[in-house]
Amino acid sequence: MRYVPHTKEEIKAMLEAVGLRNVDELFSDIPTEALLKRHLQVEGGWDEEQLRAYFRKAASSIPDANSAVYFLGGGVYDHYVPSAVDKIIALPEFYTAYTPYQAEISQGTLQAMFEYQSLICELTGMEVANGSLYDGASAVAEAVLMAMRINGKRRVLVSECVHPDIIEVLRTYQLGQDFEILTLPQKEGVTDLSELEDLSNVSCLVMQNPNYYGFLENMNQASELIHKAGGLFVAAVDPLSLGVLKSPHEYGADVVVGEGQSLGNHMSYGGPHFGFFATKMDYIRYMPGRMAGQTVDVDGRVGYVLTLQTREQHIRREKATSNITSNHWLMALASAVYLSLMGGSLPELGQTILNRSTYLAQKLASVGYPLWQRQYFFKEFPIKARDAEAVQEALADSGYYVGPVIDEHTLLVAVTEKRTKEHMDKLIELMEGLR
């Protein structure tokens, strides 16, 4: 379509309508030193090969998961992704961000979503799951909103050991919503449950396990305390930890959420990933997002539909349970493929991660980097260092990436199944040399 600019008369009319004198006033919130005061100097167009060459050169200076060694934690991890995962999600039948608006035409997509939901239920021990959310943080926030819809209470308890980004997203959701967020302090790296005193009018308690530091929380005690007060328990979990830890169902979680990146999704510079969301059948009509259901057609054949569509696109906005629309379904599909391939091996995988992270933590302590707190952990752990940022930068210069930095003297280290003994021993050698 040919570009037709606005006429001077149209621009004048629009500026008058919004009470401005000139176009520059539209951008008054941008610092003047950041504004370009000349015409763009753009070269002529490139052909395809020139464009490819440009991006090859640009990409060559950026380390990827195969050219560096990652011990990065804090929410995104360098896990193994089977080749079949990328192959299957790239099929043209699946490769789209959308579930079609006439969704029942795409029976393969809906069946895959149904299978994904079934796998999440099996993993968490819960009765029903939705078709995924944007990420783990939005899943936590939607769980809090759901809890308030269920019991009508407007106070939310959140552990300080929950990932700070999750807490920040929850505070963003709080804008325009009438509810109060209270935080439970941490003590020695885990939630101080002795502070659970005034639980009146508390809608739910949000805890993460393993928590932001990688430490394991007392989820049984937390569940008992909040349920005695008449609130709901929201558990944010690492799905791979469930191969070796109790399922959330076993300690009485009402809603189970989490970040799904570790289930067959690459790090991808932080996203896109997806959030999983599972709960009890009693709460199915309060659940956000879309959900695939199995039924039969008029001829008795098994078919799949989007069921209980309580999104704002389908019913009156004030009656909707969420405004989740184009979710990260393609990434959830990757997790369904991953779980189908790896599901039976999750206990072995979890034990491998546990053994390797324990080995590294013990060895680092022996060369002067002890645990920040003595707690049980899974996959990641915080260590003490004289200058955490300096250690992080020096290791990066050698192609080894650790972090994030928690404070001046503490940084996280994560160990996945991709980290070999050779990787870990080299990291130990490098860090010993920095003492």
From Swiss-Prot:
EC numbers, comma separated: 1.4.4.2
Give a single Pfam family match.
Answer: GDC-P
GO BP, sorted A to Z: glycine decarboxylation via glycine cleavage system; nucleoside metabolic process
By its UniProt entry, which SUPFAM superfamilies does this protein fall under?
PLP-dependent transferases
Supply the InterPro entries for this chain.
Answer: GcvPA (IPR023010), GDC-P_N (IPR049315), GDC_P (IPR020581), PyrdxlP-dep_Trfase (IPR015424), PyrdxlP-dep_Trfase_major (IPR015421), PyrdxlP-dep_Trfase_small (IPR015422)
Disulfide bond listed as a keyword? no
* GO MF annotation list: glycine dehydrogenase (decarboxylating) activity
- Gene3D superfamilies the record matches: Aspartate Aminotransferase, domain 1 (3.90.1150.10), Type I PLP-dependent aspartate aminotransferase-like (Major domain) (3.40.640.10)
- UniProt catalytic activity: N(6)-[(R)-lipoyl]-L-lysyl-[glycine-cleavage complex H protein] + glycine + H(+) = N(6)-[(R)-S(8)-aminomethyldihydrolipoyl]-L-lysyl-[glycine-cleavage complex H protein] + CO2
The UniProt record lists the keyword Phosphoprotein? no
Where, by residue number, does the polypeptide cross the bilayer? none
Q: Sorted alphabetically, which keywords does the UniProt record give?
A: Oxidoreductase
Domain of life, per lineage: Bacteria
Q: What does this protein do?
A: The glycine cleavage system catalyzes the degradation of glycine. The P protein binds the alpha-amino group of glycine through its pyridoxal phosphate cofactor; CO(2) is released and the remaining methylamine moiety is then transferred to the lipoamide cofactor of the H protein.
Q: Enumerate the HAMAP family for this protein.
A: GcvPA (MF_00712)
Question: What family does the database annotate?
Answer: Belongs to the GcvP family. N-terminal subunit subfamily.
Q: Oligomeric state and partners?
A: The glycine cleavage system is composed of four proteins: P, T, L and H. In this organism, the P 'protein' is a heterodimer of two subunits.
Q: What is the recorded name of this protein?
A: Probable glycine dehydrogenase (decarboxylating) subunit 1
Q: Which organism is it from?
A: Coprothermobacter proteolyticus (strain ATCC 35245 / DSM 5265 / OCM 4 / BT)
What's the encoding gene here? gcvPA
